[in-house]
Amino acid sequence: MVVVEADHLIGRPPHVSWEQAGALFVAGTTAYAAVHAVSLKAGDTVVISGAADGVGSIAVQLAKILGAKVIGLASAANHTWLAEHGVIAVAYGEGVADRIRAASGGKIDAFIDAFGGGYVDLALELGAAPDRIDTIIDFAAAAKHGVKTEGNSAAANTQVLVELASLIDTGRLEIPIAKVYHLADVRDAYQDLARRHTRGKIVLVP
């Protein structure tokens, strides 16, 4: 049994599945906080690393809803999905800075790092100001360069959950579910997660 205060809960809209609802709390609120941390507005160009992962796949959609031009860093297998959601897909690897410059027209306004491993440095190299860079994973780089780490700031905000659930319910936001595992297969789920090649969220069910 789990006991939760009533004001920490929201109703599940009819068009939101239990799997989507389960994935929404952490990934959805983290993506929401990261997108709003970099102060996106219509016409801005934002780069998002890990753009097809659990958090990134939601962040790219929220950025598009705000009217931003979104460049998503992802493996080639996820480029079609990103393009279907209006995102300019860019491959990882050597030459990524030049590919981003080509896709952006030479200038970016903001960078959301949902992957880690040097992307804060890349964001600075591309000219994003520290106060418009947010990382949800590379806290050492954030401390070194003074960039934001606001990925969890919306977690306890039920109004954010209500807003996200409404976007799903009205078809404006998709929560990609990579795979659903039963709790007995939790080891397999974590091994899948560790490979970092999933599109969207991995969900555990009883």
Regions found by a protein language model. Give the residues of each.
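Terminal helix/beta-alpha structural elements that buttress the NAD(P)+-binding lobe
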Residues: 1-206
